[in-house]
Amino acid sequence: MDVNPTLLFLKVPAQNAISTTFPYTGDPPYSHGTGTGYTMDTVNRTHQYSEKGKWTTNTETGAPQLNPIDGPLPEDNEPSGYAQTDCVLEAMAFLEESHPGIFENSCLETMEVVQQTRVDRLTQGRQTYDWTLNRNQPAATALANTIEVFRSNGLTANESGRLIDFLKDVMESMDKEEMEITTHFQRKRRVRDNMTKKMVTQRTIGKKKQRVNKRSYLIRALTLNTMTKDAERGKLKRRAIATPGMQIRGFVYFVETLARSICEKLEQSGLPVGGNEKKAKLANVVRKMMTNSQDTELSFTITGDNTKWNENQNPRMFLAMITYITKNQPEWFRNILSIAPIMFSNKMARLGKGYMFESKRMKLRTQIPAEMLASIDLKYFNESTRKKIEKIRPLLIDGTASLSPGMMMGMFNMLSTVLGVSILNLGQKKYTKTTYWWDGLQSSDDFALIVNAPNHEGIQAGVDRFYRTCKLVGINMSKKKSYINRTGTFEFTSFFYRYGFVANFSMELPSFGVSGINESADMSIGVTVIKNNMINNDLGPATAQMALQLFIKDYRYTYRCHRGDTQIQTRRSFELKKLWEQTRSKAGLLVSDGGPNLYNIRNLHIPEVCLKWELMDEDYQGRLCNPLNPFVSHKEIESVNNAVVMPAHGPAKSMEYDAVATTHSWIPKRNRSILNTSQRGILEDEQMYQKCCNLFEKFFPSSSYRRPVGISSMVEAMVSRARIDARIDFESGRIKKEEFAEIMKICSTIEELRRQK
C-alpha cells in the first residue's frame, strides 16, 4: 500500500513535526584515520581570528605566543578574539551589582570544596593525555602514573590524598631542573619455534627510566592531546577535541567548581541543570519577558548561534574574570584558581598521530609522525595540506603546536557561560537607559536572546547593541546563522519552544534498541528507555506499546531467543525448544530463555525476573539465580546499575536501570590481542589498580565507607577495619575463638611485612 507522506502530517501541528527533520536515525558518522589535519585547522583558525594581536616568546619553552587581548576594536561581521579587558571587568561588576554577594558566596562554597576534594576526583573521566607515556590512557591509569613519577622524584605532598596537595606537587614539578620518568618499550627478536621450526617474532615488554629536562617537561605538562570528535550528526566535516593531562585537570576542576556555583545562582544560565529542570528555568525567563511586554511593547526572540565560540574565547580573559570574582579572597585561593587560565595561555596542542601515505604503485604505506612535519619536504602533500603545514610550522615544537589564544572544546563551559550571562544581564532598562531592553538564556556557546521594545526600530537597535557589546568581550554572534521570531517560538540547546516546550522525540531515537551489554542488562535498559520517554518526552501509550513490541522483536533477533514454540530456526532454537518442553510454567521463562513477553506499558518499572518470579518453576529459579553457577563470572550487582545511553545530542548520558543478578548478567572477557602489544605493561598496571580497589571495597561496604581523613594508607585502613570487624563478630558469637585468633595473626603478619618493606 502506498502512503502519501503528507497525509501523515495533516492532523499534526507544524511544530510537532519538526523532529522528523532531524538527522537522528541510522548510525552517526565516525572518523577514521588521524585527527592531525583537524587539529591543524583548529590551531590555524584560532590564530587567524587573533592575527592582529602581539607576538611574544615564552621564556621557558621558547614557544611563540599570540596575545590578542586589548587588540584593535573588533570589526563588524568578522569573528575575532580581540576581547577588551576593561569591558569584561565592567560586565563582571554589573553582574555583581545585579546579584549582590553572588561572587562572595560562590567563593566560600568553592573554598570548602577545594579543602575537601580528594585526588581520586581526577580518576573520573575517560581518556586522558598521559604525559609520562605521551599518549592517551584511562584517567585512573594516567593519574596513577603521574603520582608514581612524582613520588620517585621526591614530590610527596600528594600522599595526604587531598587534591590541593597533589596540585602543590604539580607546581613544584614545574620548578625542577629535570624529571625522571618510566616509559614502556618493546623489544622484538627473531627466534626459531621449536614445534614448527619456523622463525617467529617474539616481543618482550620492558620499562626504562628516562630523564626529561625542564623545557621538555613543561611542554608535556602544558600539552593537550587532540582527537577527532566522533558521532557528530548533521555535519559534513569532523572537528578536533582536546584532552588535557593530569597537571591541568585539577586546576580546571576548581575553576569550573567556582563557575558552576555562580551559574546555579543565575536565572539566565542553562548550565549546570538539564532536562526538565532546565526547561522550567527557561520557561520562567520567557514568561517574565512576555508578561512585561504589555500591549504597548513588541517582544522578539533570537535563536542565537555564535561563530567559533572556542577559538575566540581567551584564557587571559578568564584570568581577568577570576581575578575580579575572587577579589578580597585569601591569597592562596586566588593563586590556585588563576593557575588554570595561566596554563591555558601557554598551552600546546599535540598534533596526534600524523599523516598516512600510501603509494598505489609500490604497494607501500608509511606514516609521517607529527614530529616530522616541521622538517619534511612539502612536495609529498596535496595543496590544502601543504598550506596548513606552512602556516603551522612557525608554531611547532617537538610535534606540538603552540596555541596561546582560544580554548579548545569543552574546557571551561561553566566559566564561559558566566561571561555570556554577564552580557545578557546588561539588557536591563537601568543599564540600557533607553526604551529597549533584553534578557535571555545562555548555555556554553548556545544562546537565546529576547528583546522587548515599543516598535520595530527599537528591537533592531536592541539587537545591534547586544551584538556590539558581545564583540567587546570576544563573543561573535553570527548574523547568518541566527534568526529572529516573535517571542513564543525559538530553539535553545535543541529544545524547541512554541508557547511551551515541544517534545523533540527524535533526539531520543538512538537510545531505543538493544544495547549489547548482556541479556539481563539489555532487557532492563530497553524497557527503562521506553518508560523514561513516556515520562519526559510525550511518548504516548499507543506509540509506547508499539515501541515495546519492536524492542522485544529486536531483542529476540539479537540474542536468537525466539519463543520456544516458534518455527524460526536459529543456533539456539534446539536448546530453547528443549527447555520450553520440560518447563511446566512456560510464562515463567525469561524472554532470553525463549519465554513469552509479559511487559506492557503499565509494568515497565519492574525488572523481568521480579515480574515472572512467582510464575517460575522451582528448579528454573534455582538455576537462574544461583551465584555458584559455574558458567557465570559474577560481579556483585548493586540493585541499581548505570547504563550509558546515546542521546542524539551532547555526551553519552548515564541512565539508571534496575539490575537483578542472574545467570544472564555475564561480563564479556577482554579482547586478548592487547596482550601482545606494548600496552601490555599498562594493562597489568591497570588490573593491579582494579584489584586493589575491589579489595578495598570488600572491606568498606559503601554504606560505612567514609573518605579517609589523615594519612592512613589503604592497607592500614583495611587492617584496622578487619580487626574491628573480627572483634565484633567474635563477641557476638558469629565466629569461633580459633578463627578470631587466625584473623589477628594475619593482620599482624601484614603489618610486619609493611615494616620490613
UniProtKB/Swiss-Prot annotation:
Segments of skewed composition (Polar residues): 55-64
Compartment annotation: Host nucleus; Host cytoplasm
One annotated Gene Ontology cellular component of this protein: host cell nucleus
Extent of motif Nuclear localization signal: 187-195, 203-216
EC numbers for this chain: 2.7.7.48
Catalyzed reactions per annotation: RNA(n) + a ribonucleoside 5'-triphosphate = RNA(n+1) + diphosphate
All residue ranges annotated as the RdRp catalytic domain in the record: 286-483
Origin superkingdom: Viruses
Gene3D superfamilies for the chain: 6.10.140.720
Any one Pfam family match given in the protein's UniProt record, by short name: Flu_PB1
Segments for region (Promoter-binding site): 249-256
PTM characteristics: Phosphorylated by host PRKCA.
Main localization (coarse): host cell
GO BP: DNA-templated transcription; symbiont-mediated suppression of host gene expression; symbiont-mediated suppression of host mRNA transcription via inhibition of RNA polymerase II activity; viral RNA genome replication; viral transcription
Region listing for Disordered, in residue ranges: 50-82
A GO molecular function held by the record: nucleotide binding
Function: RNA-dependent RNA polymerase which is responsible for replication and transcription of virus RNA segments. The transcription of viral mRNAs occurs by a unique mechanism called cap-snatching. 5' methylated caps of cellular mRNAs are cleaved after 10-13 nucleotides by PA. In turn, these short capped RNAs are used as primers by PB1 for transcription of viral mRNAs. During virus replication, PB1 initiates RNA synthesis and copy vRNA into complementary RNA (cRNA) which in turn serves as a template for the production of more vRNAs.
Family: Belongs to the influenza viruses polymerase PB1 family.
Subunit field text: Influenza RNA polymerase is composed of three subunits: PB1, PB2 and PA. Interacts (via N-terminus) with PA (via C-terminus). Interacts (via C-terminus) with PB2 (via N-terminus); this interaction is essential for transcription initiation.
Name listed for the protein in its UniProt record: RNA-directed RNA polymerase catalytic subunit
Organism, as annotated: Influenza A virus (strain A/Udorn/307/1972 H3N2)
